[in-house]
Amino acid sequence: MNGLTRVRSVLEFNEKDSDQGVERNYLYYKSDSAHIVTEKQEADIINSTYWKKMLFLDGTLQSTLRDEVIYHNALVHPLMDTLQSKDDILILGGGEGATAREVLRWSKVKSLMMVDYDKELVEFMKYHGPEWSMGAFHDRRLTVMFHDAWAFIKTGIEYDGVIIDLTDPDLKTERWPELLKNTLASVKTRKGGFVMNAGLYQPWSTKKLKDLISIVKNLCSRNLEFRYYVYTTFVPSFNGEWTFIVVAHKGKFMVEPEFSDVIPAWIKRGIKMLPDELLDEYIDGVPQTSPIHK
């Protein structure tokens, strides 16, 4: 039996990325992988040979243990660093618990409300993916409720900050103007702000992002004490730059390299503001042929 090597069984998971219009295959180990069909959606955690554990919802990649820290640091800390008060924070979505984990790193947070519409998914993540939350669900400051985000934000409860960590915005089927209007109303009295995941930035296809920014711009035009900011960071497992939009009360908002010491330097250096001129649809990747006189 000398020289006999035991080989772990490797399977293949297929993802259809509707945003980029491509399919991807991931090799993974059956051990430490899990699958569930909830009343709301289908969820898979696969133990990838490269990305470690990966979370898919309805077949679309949401997060990997190898690089989720990039996304969640970029989503949470620029807003948190901006808020004058951090007493009461709301998360809409964030079922895996990593967003809550990052918010709870701030000692000034007294109360964190997390609202997700899928209780079965949250329980699934607690058991099969505790590496995402890293104990956040046991923090006494955290309360988890299971409601629709659009309905919950209408309750009129005030917060210092709101973090919208829902799946990529679908402007055709979801009422985003209503959600963002009510979200701003929930932070207006306290002069707070909100941040949202705005999806993939593709220079050759910016209409969806521009439409989303237009909603935010219109909100700020009717609430002059607030300003909006758009920034990106590269997330390797997403194969591109991810976009975030912040609406914050006039004052400090820094997303340049000097901001927020809580973010690791290697992540911070990749977070950049997205100028308006990079949203023009004429950017199509065609090489420029005009002469350069320099």
Q: Across the structure, where does each feature detected by a protein language model lie?
A:
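Soluble small-group transferase modules, centered on the S-adenosyl donor enzyme superfamily
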Residues: 2-52, 62, 221-294
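The AdoMet/dcAdoMet-binding core of the Class I SAM-like
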Residues: 2-18, 63-213, 217, 240
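A general beta-strand register signal
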Residues: 56-57
